[in-house]
């Protein structure tokens, strides 16, 4: 295993010009696969409200749900840095509540850092969380928790005033102690300027190639939803098609009685005859066979190798 990725690793990547690869994960199996593929950072995004739970926004996601999914991802990751979103209304009410909830993601969920949305108005919140020894990643531009305020999922920072505000917010978050910053749904020229002005890494999603790294929702890059086609997503696979084909083949074999076949079934160790209607024999306790003598079902389901 390569060295564990930390926030200092990510800062060093920016300094040497090595791009940061970040992707969402919501369970241990995906975490293990994505880490094996080379992920530097695994983000447990509140996007799970949409891609896992079926909501039309991230707003219904709760702290308990974020802790649950964060813990699952942390169990599947060994090398990658694990960062978890603070969900809607988990940090906006007070700094005390923000620190408590950030602490839950670290203590109960096993996250290495947390991410929150918002600009200079949350600089004090960032300071409070960092003071509690919890690293914070910021998030500017198209911030999904502010979907109603923005009037939908629309590109941010196209006008000069809005672009200047995003730059000012980025500088404020860096000053407050954020170790990295997600830039979502902003023009590539603005993302380039912000990246050049900051000493901390920027990670883009729909923000052009000049950010210090990139992040995508794993379900999007894997082609799990053919009806979701945003401009900023490139599909590297068609898992929707592959899964449909594989599951369809399974269903077809079940319906025609072809599965399970002899290869996928178990046999008794000796011939057993059970006469119809015969009374059941008295129970006889046999000595336990050595564990190695029994036929094993296979590796423990779901546990990474």
From Swiss-Prot:
Keywords: Cytoplasm, Magnesium, Metal-binding, Pantothenate biosynthesis, Transferase. One of its GO terms (cellular component) is cytoplasm. It comes from the Bacteria. It catalyses: 3-methyl-2-oxobutanoate + (6R)-5,10-methylene-5,6,7,8-tetrahydrofolate + H2O = 2-dehydropantoate + (6S)-5,6,7,8-tetrahydrofolate. Mg(2+) binds at residues 46, 85, 117. Residues 277-305 are annotated as: Disordered. It is found in: Cytoplasm. Catalyzes the reversible reaction in which hydroxymethyl group from 5,10-methylenetetrahydrofolate is transferred onto alpha-ketoisovalerate to form ketopantoate. This is 3-methyl-2-oxobutanoate hydroxymethyltransferase. The gene is panB.
């Amino acid at each position: 295993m390569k060295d564990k990725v930390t926030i200092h690793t990510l800062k060093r990547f920016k300094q040497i010009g090595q791009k940061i690869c970040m992707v969402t994960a919501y369970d241990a199996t995906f975490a293990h696969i994505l880490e094996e593929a080379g992920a530097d950072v695994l983000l447990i995004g509140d996007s799970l409200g949409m891609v896992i739970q079926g909501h039309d926004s991230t707003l219904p996601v709760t702290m308990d749900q974020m802790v649950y999914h964060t813990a699952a991802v942390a169990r599947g990751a060994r090398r990658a840095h694990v960062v978890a979103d603070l969900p809607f209304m988990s940090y906006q009410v007070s700094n005390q509540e923000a620190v408590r909830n950030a602490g839950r993601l670290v203590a109960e969920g096993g996250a290495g850092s947390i991410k929150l949305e918002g600009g200079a108005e949350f600089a004090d919140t960032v300071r409070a969380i960092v003071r509690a020894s919890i690293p914070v990643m910021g998030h500017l531009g198209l911030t999904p928790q502010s979907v109603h305020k923005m009037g939908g999922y629309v590109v941010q920072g196209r006008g000069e005033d809005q672009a200047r505000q995003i730059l000012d917010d980025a500088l404020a978050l860096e000053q407050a102690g954020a170790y990295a910053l997600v830039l979502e749904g902003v023009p590539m020229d603005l993302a380039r300027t912000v990246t050049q002005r900051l000493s901390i890494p920027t990670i883009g999603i729909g923000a052009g190639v000049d950010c210090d790294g990139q992040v995508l929702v794993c379900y999007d890059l894997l082609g799990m939803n053919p009806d979701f086609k945003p401009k900023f997503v490139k599909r590297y696979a068609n898992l929707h098609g592959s899964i449909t084909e594989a599951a369809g083949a399974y269903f077809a074999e079940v319906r025609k009685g072809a599965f399970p076949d002899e290869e996928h079934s178990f046999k008794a160790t000796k011939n057993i005859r059970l006469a119809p209607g015969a009374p059941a024999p008295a129970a006889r306790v046999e000595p336990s066979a050595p564990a190695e003598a029994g036929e094993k079902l296979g590796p423990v389901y779901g546990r990474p190798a």
